[in-house]
Amino acid sequence: MGDWSFLGNILEEVNEHSTVIGRVWLTVLFIFRILILGTAAEFVWGDEQSDFVCNTQQPGCENVCYDEAFPISHIRLWVLQIIFVSTPSLVYVGHAVHHVRMEEKRKEREAEELSQQSPGNGGERAPLAADQGSVKKSSSSSKGTKKFRLEGTLLRTYVCHIIFKTLFEVGFIVGHYFLYGFRILPLYRCSRWPCPNVVDCFVSRPTEKTIFILFMLSVASVSLFLNILEMSHLGLKKIRSAFKRPVEQPLGEIPEKSLHSIAVSSIQKAKGYQLLEEEKIVSHYFPLTEVGMVEASPLSAKPFSQFEEKVGPGPLGDLSRAYQETLPSYAQVGAQEGVEEEQPIEAAAEPEVGDKSQEAERVSTEGEETLAVLEEEKVEPPEVEKEAEKEETPPEKVSKQELTPEKAPSLCAELPGEDTRPLSRLSKASSRARSDDLTV
């Protein structure tokens, strides 16, 4: 037979661009078809027509009977089968090589565009060129280790070539059955013209030829099974990837990026605008003032336990004493109201807490004397009272009293027996009057 090296070199390219099952199919094709067909089958069918003998002397009858028994030689049929089955693989290899060349050209074009966009970076061009050269060298020198992914149009072409291989395998198996059947009989009877009657013809090596036919049909069946298995493998792989894509895509394709906070100083501030920042919550402590304190001085923040100690309940005797010291009598309240009507309260004249307690005690001791003073005021001469008032009242109070002279007679008309002056003044006036009586 002829040289099969050319077809073998082409089919080696298919091995690089096919799946595992496709490589097994190529192994079956090379070893069990081409190798056996080239070594053993030629010797078995070498004397096919010369050994076909018929029991007639009619010229042409033997040739006509051989043509009817074997319309095409088995060897030539199997060669055609190998060629037709390998043709889709050759088409696929051509498309794969074209795809690889286009990818290489696209990468070279992108590299040139990158080099043109950065003309100043001369130092960076050298390692890029070295990497590209290494990639080209590895793809050209180490062909066996090169990985190729089946996707897109390349995958569709691969599936189509498997379908055509399957169709050709089925077609040749069916054709072989209709032409020869699956066995060769040693006796063949022929009645074609120009044979005078039914002629008996005898086939050489029928058992050996039957074994070869069965072997080749079994190899064709294995190739057909591998094609179907490869189709199912690709289909299941595609379905599995379609089911896994919506689950794995968001986890794998989301890039991990550090999110900048609002208050980062690296953000450029626009003119007239300020970055939004959260205000820090400042805790203020407002301590409770102690009982009896008029003004609470600002205190620094202290632990809560100290405030609990200050605010904690004390003995009942202390509280009653504090209330006695701070609560004024009815007479003091009336005196304060009279002073508020006559003049505003002066801040500088407010007594301290200790003076208030002393004055409250003094007022309580002198409460009895005020009743006697009120009775003696009717007998005392008015000049003494006026002098005492002039000595005690400052000029500001005198001017304010002169501005409101109408209030005194009205109050006297309503309450003729009572005096509206404060008790402190009355006590001082009474003591002054008593001293004057003694001197007189």
Swiss-Prot record:
Start-end of Low complexity biased regions: 423-432
GO CC terms: connexin complex; plasma membrane
Ranges lying in the membrane without crossing it: 2-12
Region (Disordered) residue spans: 108-144, 334-440
Membrane side Extracellular: residue ranges: 43-71, 183-210
Location in the cell: Cell membrane; Cell junction, Gap junction
Transmembrane spans: 22-42, 72-92, 162-182, 211-231
Tissue specificity statement from the Swiss-Prot or TrEMBL entry: Detected in eye lens (at protein level). Eye lens.
Cytoplasmic-side positions: 13-21, 93-161, 232-440
Bias-annotated ranges (Basic and acidic residues): 353-365, 375-405
Protein's GO biological process: cell-cell signaling; gap junction-mediated intercellular transport
PANTHER family, per database record: CONNEXIN, GAP JUNCTION ALPHA-8 PROTEIN
Complex and partners: A hemichannel or connexon is composed of a hexamer of connexins. A functional gap junction is formed by the apposition of two hemichannels. Forms heteromeric channels with GJA3.
Protein's recorded name: Gap junction alpha-8 protein
Organism: Ovis aries (Sheep)
